[in-house]
């Protein structure tokens, strides 16, 4: 008799931690079909990136410049408290487009991805510092396992934002898309800051820039049989979590 093999399959895919909570939150705010009954405020106690401090900080003069291989984010951080000195960790998040191509080919995208961060020096009350953070363009790539079978960069609009945490980042991006607490009937937890958002547009789907490694070797699928949906013994039996339908995941 042949051996019997068993394995555990985690259906969440990329939607673990903040990538799930913030993606579903954005879908609820935007009224995306099948987002379901989900309340971010009663689900998440502290968002990814959250930190306490004895003082407060404000961001200003947000700017992003593009070079051939990277984006450079610059912003001014000011200690707005009156008593305590402190350091601030500036976090940079981006959102990539979730396109028809992605949906057709089983590619998933989170509402926000951390792509860079930097910590200021100790700032006295009222003091400021300009922070520079470099984000390599490779951060924008997504692996397409089903069609291109290599890394791609989707066509569409990419949003970059400086934020205090992942939830703040998504609210900033939602604000840049025109959403507010008022026009979403309170589905949005707070208004975002459009002054801390920059949009970059990729005109065409790119399937070549990140399709080879540093040594020139082609990057492509090697172990398709490890995917239960591509295995000859159990094809198509696993439904991965996707914003297209949250119905098979409960909290």
Task: Give a label for each model feature.
Residues 2-8, 247-251:
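Conserved small/polar residues in nucleotide/adenosyl-binding loops
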Residues 1-3, 16-17, 26-31, 85-87, ...:
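Acidic/polar loop patches that form or flank catalytic/metal-binding clefts of enzymes
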Residues 36-244:
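Intrinsically disordered, low-complexity Ser/Thr/Gly-rich stretches
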Residues 7-57:
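Catalytic cores of secreted or luminal carbohydrate-active enzymes
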């Amino acid at each position: 008799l042949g051996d019997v093999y068993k394995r555990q399959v985690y259906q969440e895919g990329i939607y673990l931690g903040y990538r799930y909570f913030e993606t579903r939150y954005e879908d609820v705010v935007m009224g995306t079909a099948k987002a379901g009954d989900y309340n971010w405020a009663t689900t998440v106690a502290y968002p990814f990136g959250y930190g306490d401090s004895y003082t407060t900080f404000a961001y200003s003069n947000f700017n992003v410049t593009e070079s051939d291989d990277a984006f450079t984010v610059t912003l001014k951080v000011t200690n707005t408290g009156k008593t305590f000195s402190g350091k601030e960790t500036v976090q940079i998040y981006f959102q990539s487009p979730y396109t028809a191509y992605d949906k057709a080919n089983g590619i998933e995208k989170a509402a926000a991805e951390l792509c860079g961060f930097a910590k200021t020096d100790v700032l006295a009350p009222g003091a400021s510092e300009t922070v520079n953070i470099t984000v390599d363009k490779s951060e924008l790539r997504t692996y397409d396992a089903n069609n291109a079978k290599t890394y791609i960069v989707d066509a569409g609009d990419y949003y970059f934002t400086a934020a205090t945490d992942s939830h703040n980042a998504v609210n900033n991006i939602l604000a840049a898309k025109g959403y507010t607490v008022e026009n979403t009937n309170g589905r949005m937890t707070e208004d975002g800051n459009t002054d801390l958002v920059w949009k970059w547009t990729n005109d065409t789907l790119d399937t070549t820039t990140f399709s080879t490694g540093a040594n020139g070797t082609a990057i492509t699928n090697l172990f398709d049989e490890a995917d239960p949906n591509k295995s000859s013994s159990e094809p198509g039996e696993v439904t991965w979590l996707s914003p297209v339908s949250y119905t098979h995941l409960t909290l």
